Amino acid sequence: MCSTYGLLSFEFSDTAAMDPIFFSPTNGIPSESKLATYMNRQNVATPSGYGLNNGFSLLNLDSPLNKKSQVTPQSPEFIPTRLGSTPNFYAPYHNAPMQLSNGLNGVNGLTAAAAAAAAAAAAAAAAVPSSTSSASSASVTISKTANGGASMLALQKTASIASVTIAQQQPQHPQKQQQHPPSVGGGAVSAASAPIAISGAPPNPAAAPFVSSMSAQTPLKGRGAMMRQESPTAAMISGAGPGEKSPPHGMTPHGASPIPSALPTSVHQENVGGTIYFYPTANAQNSQPVVNSMVVDGTHPALHGVSAVAPMSAGVPAAMMYTGHVYPGPSSNVVTMQPKTLLESAFFMPDEMRAEVLARNEISNLIMDAAEAAQHALPLEVENYHALYPLEPPAQPLHAKLTFPATTYRATHNTTGYKYCLRRIHGFRLQSTKCMTLVEMWKKLQHTNVVQLREVFTTKAFGDNSLVLVYDYHPGSQTLLAKYFTPAPETNGYTDPFQGEARPFSHKSNMQRTSNGPLLPEATIWSIIMQLTAGLKAIHHAGLACKVLDPTKIIVTGKRVRFSSCCISDITQFDPNASNPLALVNMHQQDDLTALGRLVLALACRCLQSVQRDNVQSSIDMVTRNYSTDLRNFIVYLFTTNNRRSVTDLMPMIGARFYTQLDALQSKIDMQEDELAKEMENGRLYRILVKLNSINERPDFNLDCTWSETGDRYMLKLFRDYLFHSVTEDGRPWLDHAHIVQCLNKLDAGSIERVQLMSRDEQSVLIVSYAELKNCLENAFSELMSSAAN
């Protein structure tokens, strides 16, 4: 049987194109290898074309290794082409259509237009009937650019110049002629035209228009200086280790994998110089086409009528053109908000945020020791809650209007495992269940400045009749009283004789340096006012009243202010004989506004005694001297009880300060979202480390004690040493976060960049690509998963 092969040769207008390097007789392949035998067959085109010196010549171990260019941490030069993830923890990402090209935006150094034109010319030539023995002719004009790269300047079809020769052999037995599978590009050249190198070596140049090189211009190459993907920390990070400069990365079409997971039976595999080559055998006519070292489904609807080398259309959505899942670096709008500290901030959250989160986690996980448990004598379980932990000393008075002591606990729900705050009212017996109407109204109220009520029940688990109210738990919170009205510790043994309740209000010299600290900035006071009025507005619009608006029942979590202990007064002061429980709600709402004015005045003076009846006028005069007129008018309006007031009337008094508060909140959201994206990448790298450490140094697998030291696993072991155990020239450990993160990202992306791995005895040196390492990692971990499932 004879096969029809199309022989395509380009005639360069520049004599430099005839350099012998383009016609290497051995191509860096040993003559005794099967690959050399295959390429020397008469029915295979002679290797020629641009890019050969960038391919097989790289197998020479004597060639110098270029230093890496500066790369942004967590922003490697290779952008993976996989989009989305499945619920499976170790499941790979899916591919998305990307542009197939190499470093020159084309195929084997040609531009996209030239590649498409060459493919069209070959397709037209292939359409000539097999009975015609004359060769069709076409002219492809290629010129050399200033930098030595070939660019397509013109594509001319003429009948006189036979620059492109298509040799066709007529089969001796037409009735036995085999049907060749159509190529991806629409031409008639079989997939058996050239071997394919998985590590980035170019395929047979004779099939250049039909078999794309596995190298493409990445979106990060040549990008603008102000693009979103640019990281400001790129200038601070040097090269991440030895190795050649990263060549462009190949983009794969939809439905294709950058690493062949299942090769046709007629495709031969050979490892030459650390590079795995795949090429079809003689009976590969009906096999599945192999393009760009990947198995392409010819029946995929995305490939019908689409050329494999066609450029990306301008109509393709941006989400389809850039599908990388590697952290692109911080946003330009949050760079100025991030702390200028160590380089580690490029990988991890700031120390201040980490300390705050860790402190909250530590508070949430506190447990009592034996002495504390004996002192409090808490029950093991209360209704549906267990693991009670006291948040304040026991038997603290709840409020001046209430005579029942109260205690606050943190508890864990038995079913969900969530932590809640339990407020226990000691010795309270519920007289009527009519108050549950108000409880249901409070449970429906949801606001960011109000601690939400979840549940109310009575219990005897504490040894008495107790009322328990269940609220959301906000760890690390403190009351407004503890934050702004707690006396500061005295230094050098000095004690102010006029402090606390014993200090007369006429002691003017101490008003500027109160025992509770210096006066608060006006911006802080307005921030508290806006949050309190927002929560109070939600309460009043729900037809309820707070009733306990004082510093002991307002909590502060970071910079968030919330109303707490809501609904307690509605239960403890409920009149079962009243026909309408909401009849007096308007009066209580007016009391809330007066209490808000007293609280703001106390904050401005930083003293609780400033709101006493005899001291109010002097305190307002002090506010006039130290703060703006708007704050004074705000307080005076709340103290005026002659007219009916509304919380809505307070909004114009706040004025444009609301926009300042909104801008601060949005800036904080931007920074937190950027930190979240950073930590999400850390989780992705963690999954790669889990796979590596599950394979490396495994003592036994299926009764094979040497499983982790042989085969593909040996390369993973050497890669582990290259990743974590590198040393400097003088033998000192080389600890570089950028090196570790960058290599893990390249491994996850399946980069075609090659890395030099050396054994610990320095007797073995392997040069492999990250794509091969990823293939080894996936195969080895799949073996572990299969064995664990069985």
From Swiss-Prot:
Residues 695-790 are annotated as: Knob domain. Keywords: ATP-binding, Coiled coil, Cytoplasm, mRNA processing, Nucleotide-binding. It is found in: Cytoplasm, P-body. InterPro entries: DUF4797 (IPR032050), Kinase-like_dom_sf (IPR011009), PAN3 (IPR030844), Pan3_PK (IPR041332). GO terms for molecular function: ATP binding; poly(A) binding. Pfam families: DUF4797, Pan3_PK. Residues 168-191 have a biased composition (Low complexity). Residues 166-191, 235-259 are annotated as: Disordered. Belongs to the protein kinase superfamily. PAN3 family. Homodimer. Forms a heterotrimer with a catalytic subunit PAN2 to form the poly(A)-nuclease (PAN) deadenylation complex. Interacts (via PAM-2 motif) with poly(A)-binding protein (via PABC domain), conferring substrate specificity of the enzyme complex. Interacts with the GW182 family protein gw. Interacts with Gyf. The N-terminal zinc finger binds to poly(A) RNA. This is PAN2-PAN3 deadenylation complex subunit PAN3.
